[in-house]
Amino acid sequence: MSPAQQLTLPAVIVVASVMLLGCEGPPPGTEQIGYRGVGMENYYNKRQRALSIQANQPVESLPAADSTGPKASEVYQNVQVLKDLSVGEFTRTMVAVTTWVSPKEGCNYCHVPGNWASDDIYTKVVSRRMFELVRAANSDWKAHVAETGVTCYTCHRGNPVPKYAWVTDPGPKYPSGLKPTGQNYGSKTVAYASLPFDPLTPFLDQANEIRITGNAALAGSNPASLKQAEWTFGLMMNISDSLGVGCTFCHNTRAFNDWTQSTPKRTTAWYAIRHVRDINQNYIWPLNDVLPASRKGPYGDPLRVSCMTCHQAVNKPLYGAQMAKDYPGLYKTAVTQEALAGSAPASEAAPAAATEAAPEAPAQEVPAAEAVPAAAEPGAAEAAGSVEPAPVEEVAPAPAAQRL
């Protein structure tokens, strides 16, 4: 063996060993989520799962407070959202929220010291709207959050700004006018796939068409382009990464578009996408004029939410811990629901109707051809505050029980 060969063999062994370090150690965990023998399984790393469970522990609920006595609005000034709570429950809720959102900063993160009624601090205005957001989520979007619900801690996890909030990504700078459409950027947003790096702005902020699969075998019957398919798959990669699952969590991969072969989770995901859009458009964008520059992106757009903001790589946030049920202030009261019944957004009305009657399965029409979402180009976020109406064919899916 020549000296060169003697040096090459150890080098190959070292390189191969380094490459193997990037692989997950066997055996992986497996969960059957569909019919046996058809690949409807979810795979996970057992070591990573144990670490994830440890990192997603809920906060212990505070002891119950007296629900009788005067209301908070009768004792304190400028109480606009939680005015239906007793003083005891109101105080308990304030302490809990401080623990969930600003444990280090304390009450003064949202209140002017010495004058808790003052609105002269932007965080007070924002937090009031966030209370309304949580109440709407728990009361109007049960098709998404079910009876588990959400709390401030679901997103914040002890941080004033949620760790996984996002803004429109301008992408890398190019020296010429020839720009790719976002591929090969190596973005965590699409799980480092070679796909457009910002599927969040067009699909979770705006309401661009997501469906691209046709119903016929021949491609000529489907006007959707390959480029549009890349945007859609970028969103799917983001959702999978955000929930820590694979495609088969929602879809049967032999027919991605067929609702009758999909899992019940796809119905939940349908509502979840619309819930996220509702949060971004109706609760966060209207606060943009109140937020400081430090809470905005390069285009001046506010920090918004995506699936990752709440789920944090877990298919059920905090593994389904029911924290909200211990805090009545995080739900709309009967009085509040009656007052808002006439002004509820249409997107919020759909989930409620889904539990009363079984709507037809989504129509499988061929989606209209669409241009690449404008969010890929710089400056697109300036117009992101406006949302186009949802496509006609995206009616509410049939209840999961009928598709098992």
UniProtKB/Swiss-Prot annotation:
One of its GO terms (cellular component) is plasma membrane light-harvesting complex. GO terms for biological process: photosynthesis; photosynthesis, light reaction. Heme 1 binds at residues 94, 107, 110-111. A lipid is attached at residue 23 (S-diacylglycerol cysteine). InterPro entries: Multihaem_cyt_PRC_cyt_su-like, Multihaem_cyt_sf, Photosyn_RC_cyt_c-su. Residues 346-404 are annotated as: Disordered. It comes from Thermochromatium tepidum. Keywords: Electron transport, Heme, Iron, Lipoprotein, Membrane, Metal-binding, Palmitate, Photosynthesis, Reaction center, Signal, Transport. It is a lipid-anchor. Pfam families: CytoC_RC. Binds 4 heme groups per subunit. This is Photosynthetic reaction center cytochrome c subunit. A lipid is attached at residue 23 (N-palmitoyl cysteine). PROSITE patterns: MULTIHEME_CYTC (PS51008). It is found in: Cellular chromatophore membrane. NCBIfam families: photo_cyt_PufC. Heme 3 binds at residues 236, 247, 250-251.
